[in-house]
Amino acid sequence: MFTGSIVALVTPMDDKGNVDRASLRKLVDYHVASGTSAIVAVGTTGESATLSHDEHVNVVLQTLELADGRIPVIAGAGANATAEAIALTECFNHCGVVGCLSVTPYYNKPTQEGLYQHFRAIASCTDLPQILYNVPSRTGCDMLPETVARLAQINNIIAIKEATGNLSRVGQIQDLVNDDRFILLSGDDASALDFMCLGGKGVISVTANVAARQMAEMCRLTLAGDVHAARRLNQSLMPLHRDLFIEANPIPVKWATKVLGLIATDTLRLPLTPLSASARPAVERALQHAGVL
């Protein structure tokens, strides 16, 4: 369940900004049918930063209910305050999620020791598997491989989503952790194939929101060693990997998901605003290039 194509799911909203359950059901069904390995509910792509605590928990629980055991659900549970990250994680202790994804604290820029203490405190409040999430381009904080290796010694810290796009991190973390049970997941669609070739086990993917079957197949081929076929498939996805970040995630992917009819609106919570008209043709061309539109 912690391998292959794991979708970082968008959170569908109606015109008033409330969670759209009908669209959420359609999304879950789409990923079940497309072979997605698991769903991350309310991560960065799910607009965790603009949902209240209660909304955050509710979206995860709704996703679980709609999944109904057909696909594993991972709860986004990160926060830049350790106490809030613990409070979120504790909400998911006995609800049925298979694990939690917890991002490095953003804005307050902790030291490496602060990062270690933060994640150790979260892990101590739960028996759920914990996936670390390192995305310095968004958080302003880079968790170094040495810190990852320290955290990997904690029993229920079982994986990292590495979203630096720096492929040398794969080998650095593997060498320092020296434990094949610790799972490395790419957090960067564009380099995910090469990440897996170096020993990663999958990707937590934005692209999978709109090209779920293709991402699942690309991961399957890569992990099976058929890299030539995987690269051929991935070439059709490269414009999506690029243009789904033409504006800040999840702005483009939410518009693309609406264009495909998977959600009813591309409503986002302020300060995020819908995809600008000038950026839409590039995303539309990328969808066409991938063969999904």
UniProtKB/Swiss-Prot annotation:
PROSITE patterns: DHDPS_1, DHDPS_2
Keyword Lyase: yes
Compartments, as annotated in UniProt: Cytoplasm
Keywords, sorted A to Z: Amino-acid biosynthesis, Cytoplasm, Diaminopimelate biosynthesis, Lyase, Lysine biosynthesis, Schiff base
Top-level class of the enzyme under EC nomenclature: lyase
Site residues by UniProt (Part of a proton relay during catalysis): 44, 107
Record-listed E.C. numbers: 4.3.3.7
Catalysis performed (reactions): L-aspartate 4-semialdehyde + pyruvate = (2S,4S)-4-hydroxy-2,3,4,5-tetrahydrodipicolinate + H2O + H(+)
Pfam family, any one: DHDPS
Coiled-coil positions: none
Gene3D superfamilies assigned to the protein according to its UniProt record, in alphabetical order: Aldolase class I
Record function comment: Catalyzes the condensation of (S)-aspartate-beta-semialdehyde [(S)-ASA] and pyruvate to 4-hydroxy-tetrahydrodipicolinate (HTPA).
Record PANTHER family: 4-HYDROXY-2-OXOGLUTARATE ALDOLASE, MITOCHONDRIAL (PTHR12128:SF66), DIHYDRODIPICOLINATE SYNTHASE (PTHR12128)
HAMAP family for the chain: DapA (MF_00418)
Protein's name according to its UniProt entry: 4-hydroxy-tetrahydrodipicolinate synthase
Native species: Edwardsiella ictaluri (strain 93-146)
